[in-house]
Amino acid sequence: MSKYDQFIKDVGPQKFSRGGMLWMGFLILLIVAGVVAYIDQLIEGQVVTNMRDYVLWGVYISNFVFFVATSFVGAIVVAVLRLTKSEWRRPFVRLAEIVALACIIMAGITIVIDMARPDRMLNLFIHARLQSPITWDVIIIPTFIVVSLLLLYFPLLPDLAILRDHYSGTNKRLSKIYGFFAAKWQWTQKQLKLQKKSVHLLALMIIPLGLILESIDAYLFSTTYRVGWDSSNFAPYFISGAMVAGIGALVSVVYIVRRNKQLEAYITEYHFDKMGKLFNL
Protein backbone atom coordinates (compact mmCIF):
# COMPACT_ATOMS: atom_id res chain seq x y z
CA MET A 1 0.00 0.00 0.00
CA SER A 2 1.38 3.40 -0.99
CA LYS A 3 1.78 6.23 1.50
CA TYR A 4 -1.07 8.06 -0.25
CA ASP A 5 -3.48 5.12 0.10
CA GLN A 6 -2.41 4.60 3.72
CA PHE A 7 -3.05 8.28 4.46
CA ILE A 8 -6.55 8.12 2.93
CA LYS A 9 -7.24 4.95 4.91
CA ASP A 10 -6.13 6.59 8.16
CA VAL A 11 -7.80 10.00 7.92
CA GLY A 12 -10.50 9.48 5.29
CA PRO A 13 -14.15 8.67 6.06
CA GLN A 14 -14.68 5.28 7.67
CA LYS A 15 -17.67 3.10 8.46
CA PHE A 16 -18.84 3.03 12.05
CA SER A 17 -17.53 0.19 14.15
CA ARG A 18 -19.81 -1.62 16.57
CA GLY A 19 -18.66 0.71 19.33
CA GLY A 20 -19.34 3.69 17.09
CA MET A 21 -22.86 2.46 16.36
CA LEU A 22 -23.55 1.98 20.08
CA TRP A 23 -22.23 5.47 20.79
CA MET A 24 -24.44 6.97 18.06
CA GLY A 25 -27.43 5.08 19.44
CA PHE A 26 -26.73 6.45 22.92
CA LEU A 27 -26.47 10.01 21.56
CA ILE A 28 -29.74 9.60 19.63
CA LEU A 29 -31.46 8.48 22.84
CA LEU A 30 -30.12 11.59 24.60
CA ILE A 31 -31.44 13.80 21.79
CA VAL A 32 -34.88 12.16 21.98
CA ALA A 33 -34.95 12.63 25.76
CA GLY A 34 -33.94 16.27 25.32
CA VAL A 35 -36.67 16.88 22.74
CA VAL A 36 -39.28 15.33 25.05
CA ALA A 37 -38.08 17.50 27.95
CA TYR A 38 -38.14 20.62 25.75
CA ILE A 39 -41.69 19.88 24.59
CA ASP A 40 -42.70 19.54 28.25
CA GLN A 41 -41.07 22.91 28.94
CA LEU A 42 -42.99 24.53 26.06
CA ILE A 43 -46.28 23.12 27.36
CA GLU A 44 -45.83 23.69 31.10
CA GLY A 45 -43.55 26.72 31.00
CA GLN A 46 -40.08 27.22 32.40
CA VAL A 47 -41.36 26.44 35.88
CA VAL A 48 -40.38 22.82 35.11
CA THR A 49 -36.70 23.87 35.14
CA ASN A 50 -37.07 25.02 38.77
CA MET A 51 -35.16 28.20 37.93
CA ARG A 52 -35.97 31.11 40.23
CA ASP A 53 -34.54 34.47 41.21
CA TYR A 54 -31.34 33.13 42.71
CA VAL A 55 -30.87 30.53 39.97
CA LEU A 56 -31.65 32.85 37.10
CA TRP A 57 -30.54 30.73 34.13
CA GLY A 58 -29.21 27.55 35.69
CA VAL A 59 -27.73 24.90 33.40
CA TYR A 60 -28.76 26.83 30.30
CA ILE A 61 -26.46 29.76 30.91
CA SER A 62 -23.69 27.45 32.16
CA ASN A 63 -23.81 25.52 28.89
CA PHE A 64 -24.00 28.75 26.91
CA VAL A 65 -20.92 30.24 28.58
CA PHE A 66 -18.96 27.01 28.15
CA PHE A 67 -19.84 26.59 24.48
CA VAL A 68 -19.05 30.23 23.69
CA ALA A 69 -15.73 30.01 25.53
CA THR A 70 -14.69 26.81 23.76
CA SER A 71 -15.72 28.17 20.36
CA PHE A 72 -13.89 31.43 21.01
CA VAL A 73 -10.65 29.69 21.95
CA GLY A 74 -10.85 27.20 19.07
CA ALA A 75 -11.31 30.01 16.57
CA ILE A 76 -8.59 32.19 18.12
CA VAL A 77 -6.08 29.33 18.20
CA VAL A 78 -6.79 28.50 14.54
CA ALA A 79 -6.55 32.14 13.48
CA VAL A 80 -3.32 32.88 15.34
CA LEU A 81 -1.59 29.70 14.15
CA ARG A 82 -2.64 30.35 10.57
CA LEU A 83 -1.52 33.98 10.66
CA THR A 84 1.85 33.04 12.17
CA LYS A 85 2.19 30.13 9.69
CA SER A 86 3.08 27.68 12.44
CA GLU A 87 3.73 24.34 10.75
CA TRP A 88 3.05 22.24 13.85
CA ARG A 89 -0.62 23.24 13.71
CA ARG A 90 -1.42 21.15 10.63
CA PRO A 91 -2.38 17.78 12.20
CA PHE A 92 -4.97 19.17 14.61
CA VAL A 93 -6.06 22.58 13.31
CA ARG A 94 -9.03 21.05 11.46
CA LEU A 95 -10.27 19.56 14.72
CA ALA A 96 -10.04 22.98 16.35
CA GLU A 97 -12.07 24.51 13.50
CA ILE A 98 -14.77 21.85 13.83
CA VAL A 99 -14.91 22.30 17.61
CA ALA A 100 -15.21 26.08 17.21
CA LEU A 101 -18.08 25.77 14.73
CA ALA A 102 -19.94 23.03 16.62
CA CYS A 103 -19.72 24.88 19.94
CA ILE A 104 -20.97 28.23 18.63
CA ILE A 105 -23.91 26.45 16.95
CA MET A 106 -24.72 24.76 20.26
CA ALA A 107 -24.48 28.13 22.01
CA GLY A 108 -27.11 29.51 19.63
CA ILE A 109 -29.35 26.48 20.19
CA THR A 110 -28.99 26.93 23.95
CA ILE A 111 -30.35 30.48 23.67
CA VAL A 112 -33.42 29.21 21.82
CA ILE A 113 -33.97 26.49 24.43
CA ASP A 114 -33.70 29.08 27.20
CA MET A 115 -36.41 31.28 25.65
CA ALA A 116 -39.84 30.83 27.18
CA ARG A 117 -41.50 31.87 23.90
CA PRO A 118 -39.22 30.96 20.96
CA ASP A 119 -42.10 31.77 18.60
CA ARG A 120 -41.50 35.43 19.44
CA MET A 121 -37.82 35.34 18.51
CA LEU A 122 -38.46 37.69 15.59
CA ASN A 123 -39.30 40.41 18.12
CA LEU A 124 -35.62 40.51 19.07
CA PHE A 125 -34.99 42.02 15.64
CA ILE A 126 -38.21 44.01 15.19
CA HIS A 127 -38.04 45.68 18.61
CA ALA A 128 -34.27 45.56 19.09
CA ARG A 129 -32.65 47.94 21.56
CA LEU A 130 -29.06 48.65 20.59
CA GLN A 131 -28.13 49.52 24.18
CA SER A 132 -29.02 45.96 25.24
CA PRO A 133 -26.25 43.30 25.22
CA ILE A 134 -28.91 40.71 24.35
CA THR A 135 -29.50 42.44 21.00
CA TRP A 136 -25.80 42.41 20.21
CA ASP A 137 -25.58 38.78 21.31
CA VAL A 138 -28.24 37.90 18.73
CA ILE A 139 -26.20 39.76 16.10
CA ILE A 140 -22.71 38.52 16.95
CA ILE A 141 -23.50 34.79 17.27
CA PRO A 142 -24.85 34.31 13.69
CA THR A 143 -21.96 36.43 12.40
CA PHE A 144 -19.46 34.28 14.28
CA ILE A 145 -21.12 31.11 12.94
CA VAL A 146 -20.81 32.29 9.33
CA VAL A 147 -17.14 33.30 9.67
CA SER A 148 -16.29 30.06 11.52
CA LEU A 149 -18.01 28.01 8.82
CA LEU A 150 -16.09 29.76 6.06
CA LEU A 151 -12.81 29.43 7.98
CA LEU A 152 -13.45 25.67 8.13
CA TYR A 153 -14.71 25.30 4.56
CA PHE A 154 -12.15 27.25 2.53
CA PRO A 155 -9.07 25.32 3.75
CA LEU A 156 -11.11 22.11 3.32
CA LEU A 157 -11.55 22.55 -0.45
CA PRO A 158 -8.31 20.78 -1.50
CA ASP A 159 -9.06 17.88 0.86
CA LEU A 160 -12.54 17.49 -0.58
CA ALA A 161 -11.06 17.47 -4.08
CA ILE A 162 -8.57 14.75 -3.05
CA LEU A 163 -11.41 12.55 -1.78
CA ARG A 164 -13.44 13.34 -4.92
CA ASP A 165 -10.64 12.06 -7.13
CA HIS A 166 -9.82 9.14 -4.84
CA TYR A 167 -13.36 7.73 -4.97
CA SER A 168 -13.99 8.55 -8.64
CA GLY A 169 -13.22 4.98 -9.70
CA THR A 170 -14.52 3.02 -6.71
CA ASN A 171 -17.52 4.88 -5.29
CA LYS A 172 -19.33 7.20 -7.69
CA ARG A 173 -21.85 8.35 -5.08
CA LEU A 174 -19.18 9.49 -2.63
CA SER A 175 -17.22 11.06 -5.48
CA LYS A 176 -20.25 13.14 -6.49
CA ILE A 177 -20.87 14.26 -2.91
CA TYR A 178 -17.26 15.34 -2.42
CA GLY A 179 -17.24 16.86 -5.90
CA PHE A 180 -20.24 19.01 -5.04
CA PHE A 181 -18.61 20.40 -1.91
CA ALA A 182 -15.21 20.71 -3.61
CA ALA A 183 -16.78 23.36 -5.88
CA LYS A 184 -14.74 22.42 -8.99
CA TRP A 185 -11.42 22.75 -7.17
CA GLN A 186 -8.52 21.97 -9.52
CA TRP A 187 -5.45 23.39 -7.72
CA THR A 188 -5.02 26.21 -10.23
CA GLN A 189 -2.80 29.14 -9.27
CA LYS A 190 -5.82 31.44 -9.30
CA GLN A 191 -7.74 29.18 -6.90
CA LEU A 192 -4.77 28.77 -4.57
CA LYS A 193 -4.12 32.51 -4.47
CA LEU A 194 -7.79 33.32 -3.82
CA GLN A 195 -8.02 30.65 -1.12
CA LYS A 196 -4.91 31.95 0.64
CA LYS A 197 -6.22 35.53 0.66
CA SER A 198 -9.68 34.43 1.84
CA VAL A 199 -8.34 32.33 4.72
CA HIS A 200 -5.99 35.15 5.75
CA LEU A 201 -8.85 37.66 5.76
CA LEU A 202 -11.16 35.34 7.71
CA ALA A 203 -8.42 34.67 10.28
CA LEU A 204 -8.00 38.42 10.74
CA MET A 205 -11.77 38.89 11.09
CA ILE A 206 -12.45 36.15 13.60
CA ILE A 207 -10.04 37.45 16.25
CA PRO A 208 -11.89 40.75 16.93
CA LEU A 209 -15.22 38.95 16.47
CA GLY A 210 -14.23 36.45 19.16
CA LEU A 211 -13.19 39.20 21.57
CA ILE A 212 -16.47 41.02 20.92
CA LEU A 213 -18.42 37.79 21.43
CA GLU A 214 -16.85 37.10 24.83
CA SER A 215 -17.19 40.75 25.92
CA ILE A 216 -20.89 40.86 25.03
CA ASP A 217 -21.52 37.67 26.98
CA ALA A 218 -19.76 39.24 29.96
CA TYR A 219 -22.06 42.26 29.71
CA LEU A 220 -25.09 39.96 29.95
CA PHE A 221 -24.01 39.44 33.56
CA SER A 222 -22.38 42.75 34.44
CA THR A 223 -25.34 44.94 33.41
CA THR A 224 -27.48 43.49 36.20
CA TYR A 225 -27.77 44.73 39.78
CA ARG A 226 -26.86 41.39 41.30
CA VAL A 227 -24.16 41.72 43.95
CA GLY A 228 -20.77 40.72 42.58
CA TRP A 229 -21.89 40.90 38.96
CA ASP A 230 -22.24 44.66 38.52
CA SER A 231 -18.59 45.10 37.57
CA SER A 232 -16.68 46.58 34.64
CA ASN A 233 -13.95 43.92 34.75
CA PHE A 234 -16.19 41.06 33.64
CA ALA A 235 -15.10 41.25 29.98
CA PRO A 236 -11.36 40.61 30.60
CA TYR A 237 -12.34 38.09 33.29
CA PHE A 238 -14.49 36.17 30.79
CA ILE A 239 -11.79 36.29 28.11
CA SER A 240 -9.08 34.98 30.43
CA GLY A 241 -11.40 32.32 31.82
CA ALA A 242 -12.38 31.26 28.31
CA MET A 243 -8.72 30.75 27.38
CA VAL A 244 -8.27 28.33 30.27
CA ALA A 245 -11.51 26.38 29.80
CA GLY A 246 -11.43 26.47 26.00
CA ILE A 247 -7.87 25.24 25.54
CA GLY A 248 -8.51 22.51 28.11
CA ALA A 249 -11.60 21.37 26.18
CA LEU A 250 -9.72 21.54 22.87
CA VAL A 251 -6.82 19.42 24.18
CA SER A 252 -9.33 16.88 25.54
CA VAL A 253 -11.12 16.61 22.18
CA VAL A 254 -7.85 16.22 20.26
CA TYR A 255 -6.72 13.48 22.66
CA ILE A 256 -10.02 11.56 22.42
CA VAL A 257 -10.08 11.72 18.61
CA ARG A 258 -6.40 10.76 18.42
CA ARG A 259 -6.92 7.72 20.59
CA ASN A 260 -10.26 6.65 19.10
CA LYS A 261 -9.16 7.02 15.46
CA GLN A 262 -5.62 5.74 16.12
CA LEU A 263 -3.95 8.87 14.77
CA GLU A 264 -0.82 8.62 16.91
CA ALA A 265 1.33 8.79 13.77
CA TYR A 266 -0.13 12.20 12.87
CA ILE A 267 -0.89 13.82 16.25
CA THR A 268 2.15 13.13 18.40
CA GLU A 269 3.33 14.03 21.89
CA TYR A 270 5.11 16.97 20.27
CA HIS A 271 1.78 18.57 19.42
CA PHE A 272 0.44 18.10 22.95
CA ASP A 273 3.62 19.67 24.28
CA LYS A 274 3.03 22.67 22.02
CA MET A 275 -0.61 22.94 23.10
CA GLY A 276 0.49 22.73 26.72
CA LYS A 277 2.87 25.63 26.20
CA LEU A 278 0.05 27.53 24.49
CA PHE A 279 -2.14 26.80 27.52
CA ASN A 280 0.53 28.18 29.88
CA LEU A 281 0.94 31.25 27.70
Predicted regions and their residues:
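N-terminal signal-anchor module of multipass membrane proteins
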Residues: 1-73
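Long, contiguous internal "core" modules enriched in hydrophobic/ aromatic residues
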Residues: 11-14, 20-38, 86-88, 126, ...
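Helix-boundary and loop/linker segments of multi-pass membrane transporters
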Residues: 49-54, 95-96, 226, 267-271
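Alpha-helical transmembrane segments and their immediate interhelical/interface regions
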Residues: 51-75, 109, 168-169, 235-255
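Membrane helical hairpin/interfacial module
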Residues: 55-119
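Membrane-embedded alpha-helical bundles of multi-pass integral membrane proteins
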Residues: 55-59, 125-132
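Juxtamembrane membrane-interface segments at transmembrane alpha-helix termini
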Residues: 105-108, 134-138
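Transmembrane alpha-helix boundary signature
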Residues: 111-124, 153-157
